Structure formats: C-alpha cells, structure tokens
A protein has these predicted regions:
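Active-site neighborhoods and metal-handling regions in enzymes and metal-associated proteins
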Residues: 1-229
Length: 229
C-alpha cells in the first residue's frame, strides 16, 4: 500500500529512515544500561541453575529448555528473550540447534545459549560445560575459544572499530587451527530486541561508543563431535 502511494507523489523524494533510528538505539542511556546490567545478572543466576539441572543427567534437551520460561519468571523476567538453545554433544556443533529428545552421555559438551526479557530489555548469554568427562581435544578447544573471547573483550573501548574486535578473536581461533569452524559473526547488539541493528563483524567498521551493548561470542563447531561457544 505505502510504496504505490509514494510513487504517485512525483515532487517528493523518499529515503528509508530506519537506519537513523537504529543508530540511535545502538547507544543506551544510563537508565537503559542499568536495566541491561540487571538483566545480565539475572541471566547469570539462570545459567547456573540450568547447569545444575543438566548435571543431574536425567533430562533431555527439550525438557531442560521447557523449564526456562518459568525459571526466568521466578527471577523477575517476563520470560525468554529468544528461543533457548540447550545442545548436548554433537548437537552443539549446530549453532542454531533446537532442543530435541537427546539425552546426556559422559563426555558430552553442553552448549547453553539463553536469555531473559527484563522490564523490556533482553539478555543473551552462552556457556559451554562438559558432562562428567572432558577429553584433551575438548579442553584445548574450550581454552582457545576462551582466549579469543578474553582478547576481544580487552580491546573494547571507545574508538575501536567493531570489525577489528571481530578480527582479533577470529585470528586467535585461526592460529589454533580453526577457520571455517568459526562460522558466524563475533557478536550482535542487544537491547529492547535480542538482535538489534549492528554486528561485531567484518561488515561493520563503526567505532565503539560508550553506552553500546553487544555480545562477544566466539565459537568453534566440529561437526559430528561437539561445539564450544
């Protein structure tokens, strides 16, 4: 309806203005920042609770995922901020896995990617743990991903380009022998939506500003084996 109507007005030139709004939303004011901090603190508690639930070893991925909305509500959230990911073993190599009836086996990795909606603002956090046993390969990949995460986080300050933060983490993982196994952007902006406009990726040379809120989530995904994020 709108586009044909615009075509009828010859003397006017229309420009899409959504990017202007998106850029304003990239920077959060102090009140918004505090809400984001509170949302993330709640997410810390929920992640710990989910890890303890998984440690019992008697629930499927789906059964764990189905409990999450209630857990978030118990901690003051409206519910999930996105469809949760709880992925056991080889399922963790699919970074968009949807929970199924898979059960835990000793030596499985558990990728937990969850978030809650708190007073209109989203959290998003990923953690990887291992059930009962950890192989040398799993430990090495975990430590590599953690090294990349810490190095990227250490770069974050006003004036640093988002693409350079992405490159820092990607280079470290490549030095560890993995390139195509890190198959997504390093991070995304978070706020009232869990995925707001803007990426921490090679596609964005925007400089960091105080008040920006975004994720840093490097990963390595070994098909048929396990994933770490």
């Amino acid at each position: 309806f709108l586009m044909p109507l615009m075509d009828l007005v010859d003397e006017c030139h229309f420009e899409l203005g959504s990017e202007c709004v998106d850029r304003v939303r990239m920077v959060k004011d102090e009140k918004e920042q505090q809400l984001m901090i509170e949302a993330s603190k709640i997410n810390d508690l929920v992640v710990d609770e989910v890890i303890n639930i998984c440690a019992k070893g008697n629930l499927t991925e789906k059964e764990v995922s189905d409990q999450l909305a209630g857990i978030y509500q118990k901690h003051g959230c409206t519910g999930n901020s996105f469809e949760p990911i709880v992925a056991y073993g080889k399922n963790g190599a699919d970074n968009h896995h949807s929970g199924d009836d898979s059960t835990l086996k000793p030596g499985d990795s558990i990728v937990i990617d969850i978030g809650g909606l708190y007073k209109g603002y989203c959290s998003d956090m990923t953690r990887t743990v291992f059930y009962k046993e950890v192989s040398p390969k799993q430990k090495a990949v975990y430590e590599l991903v953690l090294k990349a995460q810490k190095a990227a986080e250490a770069m974050i300050k006003p004036g640093v380009r988002l693409c350079d933060i992405d490159k820092c983490a990607r280079d470290i993982i490549a030095e560890g022998g993995y390139t195509v196994e890190f198959n997504h952007r390093l991070g995304h902006f978070i706020g009232r939506d869990v995925h707001e406009w803007g990426d921490v990726s090679q596609n964005y040379d925007i400089e960091v500003q105080e008040g920006m809120t975004f994720s840093i989530e490097p990963g390595v995904y070994l098909q048929g084996e396990f994933g770490v994020r």
